Amino acid sequence: MNYFREMHKVKLFIEKLADYHHPDVFNPWADYDPDYDVASARSIRRKQLARYLIHRIENARILLIAEACGYQGGRFTGIAMTCERMILNEHPYVNSQMVLGCQGKRTSRRDSPFIPRETQRTRGFNEPTDTVVWNAALSAGLGPNDFLLWNIFPFHPHKEDHALSKRTPTESELQDGLFFTEELLKLTGPLPVYAIGRKSEQTLTGAGYQVTGLRHPANGGATLFREGLRDSLIQTGLYNG
């Protein structure tokens, strides 16, 4: 791999991401909220996504695509299905070396009076779904660079006037997000795609992609997600658990 050429492509991709704006949507690589973000948040999140992608665009064996960026995960790290505690070495299964190959940085403010929980302020945000996905992939024998995590809508959709909330992306937003997934696939080349949740699966299949649908881990779906991923990897010969 020509590192500098590939990094240039990655940075161009991130610039495209940063150009996206939509009402009630937070763009981790372009937007800044002084109530929650440190001053250099946008730059940190861009650099962390670039590091994450450069380790995987030629090494990933599968692509796992969920629905949208969550406020406890990628909203603050810039990386899909990856929370701050993972890149701060505050997580029981995942550490910064596995995600980035180096020490990560938080972008949430330790001193923010708007972040409600003390553990979130002192240790960073934690997202249960992120833990399930990472743990399932690692337990199946995949290395950290063997799977690339993404969201069909890569930004954080939130309720009006409620920054730390979540909502389902609209159909229009999902179609907007599909463009960025297709741009990502130009970087990686063809990969087996696993769609996490119905919105991701329907958007991808509607665009003509062949995907393996997996139950979303949220709302009691963690076991079905783990079993579905394991069984599919066994069938394709990628399981090494």
Task: Describe the predicted segments one by one.
Residues 2-192, 202-207:
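A polyanion-binding, active-site-adjacent surface
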Residues 208-240:
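Short, flexible loop segments at boundaries between secondary-structure elements
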Residues 198-199:
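Alpha-helix/helix-capping structural signal
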